[in-house]
């Protein structure tokens, strides 16, 4: 029983983000389709070769995607929304990009598919759309072509396919409502056809991803698995693949399926290996997801060995990454600026492949010397002074309930704030950022590269802040912002100014399409060595008599958009960040800043996959926000900003944040989101976004007025604010000026009644 290793998928973008550059060049019309396809071929060949060189036995094929793998599956099944279809029904790479980016075959704008988070990761997928009576057929054969490609290169491959039940679960019904699960029998023949084609190519194992099996699924969905897999059995061996959580609660459903193996995430799940071994059919292969595919930390392989060794020789066993390595940067070896000690604690995708090879070899031979050697740095980290800051740990331990309570209730605070700011009815503001022009980006880049000294950099930033204030005063906004010219990214900026974080040069991870992010890494206890935003906020406030908002990114968002430590809980990290930012609130207040916004766009997306785990998360998430904000005096107004499409299931927690004002994204849902706030009888002030900043379209005064009147039917007008639905960083100045002028005019019209 020789143990093999495999990965569930590999990063697609390339070490130097070659895929991103090729996509954007093609979209801009600067390169041909052939040139784009050639970059894809080159990247796939390189990535298979790199995994093989690192000792991976079975290489994943089908993990590459031109936009995202769920969209690839939609095209495979011929599921193209009518507005994006070619007249002759054909499907090509442009069809795929149109669904992702929003264009009709004629070149006219046509709404892109909705995009949402892939389970609880920071990766996104395009949501499949289903209509009643829909037909499916094998249409886009990218998977089969890539299998041919890999086999021609002499590789031993394992195709990767998103499973039928999870695919339907991830989609949404459009138009007349019906149960999308009823489409299962219509898509199964396409899956049968794909598996038959793979069998023809001599494929032994297919990795069929059903991550929905880690969720608390409705019974009807659990019941759908057996007939689905009865229909798919027999052509090739199926490795039923789950990740991001454990499978024990759904194990009875799983063990009844006619598959030949099961992959489980032994990093994020709480499944017990001995229990799994006992309950799985004895002839099944177990793929043990022991190496974390979602983080950047070197594994303690001695621990991983101990976790699995008792079942070695008792059943067929593979060792694997917990999930696809898509969520990890590619290669640590190109990081030249990381301190040697810190660098020794990390492993990126290629290093994780090496870990899988070390683990496989040790399990096959019983010789663990190499594991001990590999694990030494991560074991030494436990005692590093870079990790532990006694002052932070002491302060965290001393938190009391009082630390998360404002001095008085909202009604008392609102009176103090009205007396201080004397704002008109329908007060106008923006969410924080203004257009990041080429000049601003060049200024920051020159400073970062050392081509510009600190004095000239500061003079340049001050000039852009001054311009933002002048623009806002000219437009007649009531509460101003400094525009965030000095910030590259709302999380990275704070991470760079807090102790306990490090940054990589090339640690890029795909978010969706061509968008990549470079998350900060939390390596130790978090603290604030010096004020972060105070100087620029104070400068902006000195330029105007109107209030200027201080702008902070909240603790839960900083946590969710970073690679967290693995040696303490997420709650601990969030509260450490909250304490650091609490001091920032106090300093902003002392500097005369009376309105402070703490953005928490990630509060909802941090929710655990299982609803039964939500309460615990929301409790500490809300507490972290309140620790951050509660130091503010009554007449300091705390704002928060959130952008999601779903509030009703967490309204209690939104209200529990106790922010004086919440601004939300509502324009795309035509104010329907406010229903949740109305039904809940939300007590504080609210700024429903009146226009969609993701679109270059300028909303008319009438359109904004109509939306605000609609909002006033749900929320008392005296508690409403007027604002766009998100920051304006990605927009140009001409449309920003035009849209804000119309927004201010609409508010003035409503004041006149």
UniProtKB/Swiss-Prot annotation:
Q: Does the keyword Transferase apply?
A: yes
| Substrates-to-products reaction catalysed | 5-methyltetrahydropteroyltri-L-glutamate + L-homocysteine = tetrahydropteroyltri-L-glutamate + L-methionine
Matching entries from Pfam families are given as: Meth_synt_1, Meth_synt_2
Q: Which GO terms describe its biological process?
A: methionine biosynthetic process; methylation
Instruction: Fetch the InterPro entries from UniProt.
Output: Cbl-indep_Met_Synth_N, Cobalamin-indep_Met_synthase, Met_Synth_C/arc, UROD/MetE-like_sf
Q: In which pathway does it act?
A: Amino-acid biosynthesis; L-methionine biosynthesis via de novo pathway; L-methionine from L-homocysteine (MetE route): step 1/1
**Which residues are 5-methyltetrahydropteroyltri-L-glutamate-binding?**
17-20, 117, 515-516, 561, 605
Could you say which residues bind Zn(2+) here?
A: 641, 643, 665, 726
Family label: Belongs to the vitamin-B12 independent methionine synthase family.
Q: What is this protein called?
A: 5-methyltetrahydropteroyltriglutamate--homocysteine methyltransferase
What organism is recorded for this protein?
Escherichia coli O17:K52:H18 (strain UMN026 / ExPEC)
């Amino acid at each position: 029983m020789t143990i093999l290793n495999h990965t569930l998928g590999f990063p697609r973008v390339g070490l130097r983000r070659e895929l991103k550059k090729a996509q954007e060049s093609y979209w801009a019309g600067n390169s041909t389709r052939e040139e784009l396809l050639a970059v894809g071929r080159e990247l796939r060949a390189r990535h298979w070769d790199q995994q093989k060189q690192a000792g991976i036995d079975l290489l994943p094929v089908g993990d590459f995607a031109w936009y995202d793998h769920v969209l690839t599956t939609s095209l495979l099944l011929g599921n193209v929304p009518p507005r994006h279809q070619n007249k002759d029904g054909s499907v090509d790479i442009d069809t795929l990009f149109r669904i992702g980016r929003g264009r009709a075959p004629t070149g006219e704008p046509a709404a892109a598919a909705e995009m949402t988070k892939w389970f609880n990761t920071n990766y996104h997928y395009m949501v499949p759309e289903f209509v009643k009576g829909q037909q499916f057929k094998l249409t886009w054969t990218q998977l089969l072509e890539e299998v041919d490609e890999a086999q021609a290169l002499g590789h031993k491959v394992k195709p990767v396919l998103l499973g039928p039940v999870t695919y339907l679960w991830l989609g949404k019904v459009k138009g007349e409502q019906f149960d999308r699960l009823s489409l299962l029998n219509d898509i199964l023949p396409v899956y049968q056809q794909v598996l038959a084609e793979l069998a023809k190519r001599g494929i032994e194992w297919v990795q069929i991803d059903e991550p929905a099996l880690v969720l608390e699924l409705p019974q009807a969905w659990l019941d759908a698995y057996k007939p689905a897999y009865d229909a798919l059995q027999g052509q090739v061996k199926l490795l039923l693949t789950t990740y991001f959580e454990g499978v024990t609660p759904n194990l009875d459903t799983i063990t009844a399926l006619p598959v030949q193996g099961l992959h489980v995430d032994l990093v994020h799940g709480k499944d017990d290996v001995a229990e799994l071994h006992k309950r799985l059919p004895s002839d099944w292969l177990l793929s043990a997801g022991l190496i974390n595919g979602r983080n950047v930390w070197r594994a303690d392989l001695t621990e991983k060995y101990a976790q699995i060794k008792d079942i070695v020789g008792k059943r067929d066993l593979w060792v694997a990454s917990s999930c696809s390595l898509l969520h990890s940067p590619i290669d640590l070896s190109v990081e030249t600026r990381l301190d040697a000690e810190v660098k020794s604690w990390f492993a990126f995708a290629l290093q994780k492949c090496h870990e899988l090879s070390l683990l496989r070899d040790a399990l096959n031979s019983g010789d663990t010397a190499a594991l001990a050697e590999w694990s030494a740095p991560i074991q030494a980290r436990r005692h590093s002074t870079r990790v532990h800051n006694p002052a932070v740990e002491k302060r965290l331990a001393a938190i009391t309930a009082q630390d998360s309570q404002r001095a008085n209730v909202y009604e008392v605070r609102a009176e103090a704030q009205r007396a201080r700011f004397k704002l008109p009815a329908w007060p106008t503001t923006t969410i924080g950022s203004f257009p990041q022009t080429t000049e601003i980006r060049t200024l920051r880049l020159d400073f970062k590269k050392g081509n510009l000294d600190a004095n000239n950099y500061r003079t340049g930033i001050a000039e852009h802040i001054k311009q933002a204030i002048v623009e806002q005063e000219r437009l007649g906004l009531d509460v101003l912002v400094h525009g965030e010219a000095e910030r590259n990214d709302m999380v990275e900026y704070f991470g760079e100014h807090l102790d306990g974080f490090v940054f990589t040069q090339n640690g890029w991870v795909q978010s969706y399409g061509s968008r990549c992010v470079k998350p900060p890494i939390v390596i130790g206890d978090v603290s604030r060595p010096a004020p972060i935003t105070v100087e620029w906020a104070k400068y902006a406030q000195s330029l105007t008599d109107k209030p200027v908002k201080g702008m902070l990114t909240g603790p839960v968002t900083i946590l969710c958009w970073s690679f967290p430590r693995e040696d303490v809980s997420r709650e601990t990290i969030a509260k450490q960040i909250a304490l650091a930012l609490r001091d920032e609130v106090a300093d902003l207040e002392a500097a005369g800043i009376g309105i402070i916004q703490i953005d928490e766009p990630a509060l909802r997306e941090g929710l655990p996959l299982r609803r039964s785990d939500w309460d615990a998360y929301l409790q500490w998430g809300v507490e972290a926000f309140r620790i951050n904000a509660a130091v503010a005096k009554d007449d300091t107004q705390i704002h928060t900003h959130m952008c999601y499409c779903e509030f009703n299931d967490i309204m209690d927690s939104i209200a529990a944040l106790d922010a004086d004002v919440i601004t939300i994204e509502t324009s795309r849902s035509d104010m329907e989101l406010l229903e949740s706030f109305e039904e809940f009888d939300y007590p504080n002030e609210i700024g429903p976004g009146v226009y969609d900043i993701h679109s270059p379209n300028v909303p008319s005064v009438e359109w904004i007025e109509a939306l605000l009147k609609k909002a006033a039917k749900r929320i008392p007008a005296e508690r409403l604010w007027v604002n766009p639905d998100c920051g304006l960083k990605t927009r140009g100045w001409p449309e920003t000026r035009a849209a804000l002028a119309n927004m201010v005019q609409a508010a003035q019209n409503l004041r006149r009644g």
